[in-house]
From Swiss-Prot:
Annotated TM spans: 117-133
Protein name: Torsin-4A
Membrane topology: Single-pass membrane protein
Species name: Mus musculus (Mouse)
Designated gene of the protein: Tor4a
Residues the record lists as Phosphothreonine modifications: 84
Lineage top rank: taxon: Eukaryota
Protein localization: Membrane
């Protein structure tokens, strides 16, 4: 190096370690000079082999430029100065969310409040429907209508249509506990066809399922309102008894049963009282009740109808494809004629569900004898039952034998069997 410029490198004490360091510093210094020379203009080139500059530069400015960071580029200084700087576009900065916060994104579809209200309404209606179905099952189990139907089919002979209509009306009414009007069943037919027997079976069944005999009222016209008694007293007594029964049933949330036998003997004042009890203007606990009227009114019309249409009646134990239509047409005619006849007597039968009981055929009377014999302790022998049935009077029409008195004389005939062994011993 030139002696006029003292070296900035420290003097090495030994040639062993300092020599490589000096070489590195020398190379670094050379690289810096070459970078600076490339950036200078052509007239201000430094002297070759030395670190001095030309007349336009000095060592102080070179060191000041070396201290600032420079970036290497292949463009010359004139090209860099001639370029116009481009205006950079400002990019939209990406919004960064903290990891601990919740990212709230805009909703693509905004649900209206009406849709939410509709969904809530559908849920409420579905819940009410399920609750109603459960109530239907509870009422059916409480009153054991299946057991009642089996008991009626087993004990009532010759009246399948009447039993089916009674059970259909009871199932429809007892499906719910709240009603808008009471149920009035009017069982009509001639003597001995099983009306009173059905009334006793209904009363026995409801006493068992309700577990309270006070909720079943049986009213007999001849017994509770005999001829010398004033009619107004009977009317007040009937109204009070009905009010007590329905009030107790309302407190226990049950449906009471009120059976009125021999309704054809009831005075008009009592029929008026019953008609008032069935009105919708009454208190709501009067609506939750079942009334059963057992009446012989219309028995003559039913007898004439059966005898005139005996040829259209199906024989027993026969089930054909057209049996439904064959049975429905006469039954509808009979119901229409009975309703017109009874409505002329009193307006009570306008709201009643009329159930006609037809005449009993001879095989049905034989079954009545066997049933009574078994109940009295006798062996229900078929031949003996047929022999007893031969002693009754019948209508002989179109190959059928209809009992004139039905099963009314069965009890008396069976009671006579107890004296036959005594007569045989003589």
């Amino acid at each position: 190096m030139d002696r006029s410029h003292p070296s900035l490198e420290p003097q090495a004490k030994g040639p062993c370690v300092i020599a490589p360091v000096r070489a590195v510093l020398r190379l670094r210094r050379r690289v810096c000079v070459l970078r600076k020379r490339r950036l200078l203009q052509p007239g201000t080139e430094p002297d070759s082999g030395t670190g001095t500059l030309g007349p336009t530069g000095s060592l102080g400015t070179l060191r000041a430029d070396l201290d600032q960071p420079k970036f290497f580029t292949f463009d010359s200084l004139t090209e860099l100065t001639s370029r116009t700087p481009r205006k950079r576009r400002r990019r939209s900065r990406v919004v960064l969310y903290p990891e601990t916060s919740r990212k709230c994104r805009p909703r693509t579809e905004r649900q209206s409040r009406a849709q939410r209200c509709l969904l809530l309404l559908v849920a409420i209606v579905g819940f009410q429907v399920l609750n109603a179905i459960e109530n239907l099952d509870d009422n059916a189990q409480r009153y054991d209508l299946d057991g009642l139907e089996k008991a009626l089919q087993r004990s009532v002979f010759g009246q399948p249509a009447a039993v089916g209509r009674i059970m259909a009306l009871l199932r429809d009414y007892l499906a719910t506990h709240v009603h808008s009007h009471p149920l009035l069943l009017a069982l009509h037919g001639p003597s001995g066809v099983g009306k009173s027997h059905v009334g006793r079976l209904l009363a026995r069944h409801f006493r068992a399922v309700l577990e309270d005999g006070a909720l079943v009222l049986q009213y007999h016209a001849r017994y509770h309102c005999p001829e010398p008694r004033p009619v107004q007293d009977c009317r007040k007594e009937l109204a009070q008894r009905v009010a007590d029964v329905v009030a107790q049933a309302e407190a226990e949330e049950k449906t009471p049963l009120l059976v009125l036998d021999e309704a054809e003997l009831l005075p008009p004042a009592l029929l008026d009282e019953l008609h008032d009890l069935l009105q919708p203007q009454r208190s709501h606990h009067f609506h939750n009740a079942i009334y059963v009227l057992l009446s012989g009114a219309g028995g003559i019309e039913i007898t004439h109808f059966v005898l005139q249409n005996a040829s259209r009646m199906l024989p027993p134990l026969r089930h054909s494809a057209g049996s439904t239509q064959t049975e429905e047409s006469p039954a509808q005619e009979l119901l229409t004629s009975l309703r017109e006849l009874l409505a002329r007597e009193h307006p009570l039968w306008h709201t009643a569900a009329i159930v006609p009981f037809l005449l009993l055929d001879k095989p049905d009377v034989v079954n009545c004898f066997r049933e009574e014999m078994a109940g009295e302790g006798f062996f229900p022998e078929q031949a003996l039952a047929e022999h007893l049935a031969e002693q009754l009077s019948y209508y002989h029409v179109a190959g059928h034998e209809f009992a004139i008195t039905g099963c009314k004389q069965v009890v008396a005939k069976v009671n006579l069997l107890q004296h036959k062994p005594a007569h045989a011993g003589h």
